Amino acid sequence: MSYSKIPAGKDLPNDIYVAIEIPANHAPIKYEIDKDTDCLFVDRFMATPMFYPANYGFIPNTLADDGDPLDVLVVTPYPVAPGSVIRARPVGVLHMTDEAGGDAKLIAVPHDKLSVLYKDVKEYTDLPALLLEQIKHFFENYKDLEKGKWVKVEGWGNADAARAEITKAVAAFQK
């Protein structure tokens, strides 16, 4: 599969495609899809034994502030297989900075055509408060045992802020 051939979405910035690298609740292994080969590589075994609280991946054909495609967490009822592409709707963004600079994490839910379970979720605040705390806690702590790495969570942004991140990342990729 060539992820470069997958558009960023069907109706940007409201309807996006996300290439999943790490399924929700998976073992603490950081996978990354290599942009040159389109292969799923083991990036590292995470030193801090934590699992991603939602499916983790990126929007193809985008470029975020950290020089990588825009990161997305997709909340689903079940873990999604690594390498899969899922159609989703952005509902928020977790603003963060790490040792490499700005590192926003979009929060999304499956498009209504995939599941009606999230049809009433329009903003990240419509998700369970505990899940939001788990996401924040994960990113505040998942690099704790890795020397030279750190994360500072700066706060949440709404669906409009998430859509603005998408628009900016698509424009940056097209430059």
UniProtKB/Swiss-Prot annotation:
Cofactor(s) this protein requires: Mg(2+)
UniProt: Mg(2+) 2 binding residues: D71
Catalytic reactions on record: diphosphate + H2O = 2 phosphate + H(+)
Residues annotated to bind substrate: K30, R44, Y56, Y142
InterPro entries (UniProt xref): Pyrophosphatase, Pyrophosphatase_sf
Alphabetical UniProt keywords: Cytoplasm, Hydrolase, Magnesium, Metal-binding
Domain of life: Bacteria
Annotated GO biological process: phosphate-containing compound metabolic process
Subcellular location(s) per record: Cytoplasm
GO molecular-function terms, A-Z: inorganic diphosphate phosphatase activity; magnesium ion binding
UniProt: Mg(2+) 1 binding residues: D66, D71, D103
Assigned GO CC terms: cytosol; extracellular space
Its EC number(s): 3.6.1.1
Protein role: Catalyzes the hydrolysis of inorganic pyrophosphate (PPi) forming two phosphate ions.
Oligomer and partners: Homohexamer.
NCBIfam families, A to Z: PRK01250.1 (NF002317)
Family that this chain belongs to: Belongs to the PPase family.
HAMAP family: Inorganic_PPase (MF_00209)
Protein name: Inorganic pyrophosphatase
Species in which this protein is naturally found: Pseudomonas aeruginosa (strain ATCC 15692 / DSM 22644 / CIP 104116 / JCM 14847 / LMG 12228 / 1C / PRS 101 / PAO1)
Gene for this chain: ppa
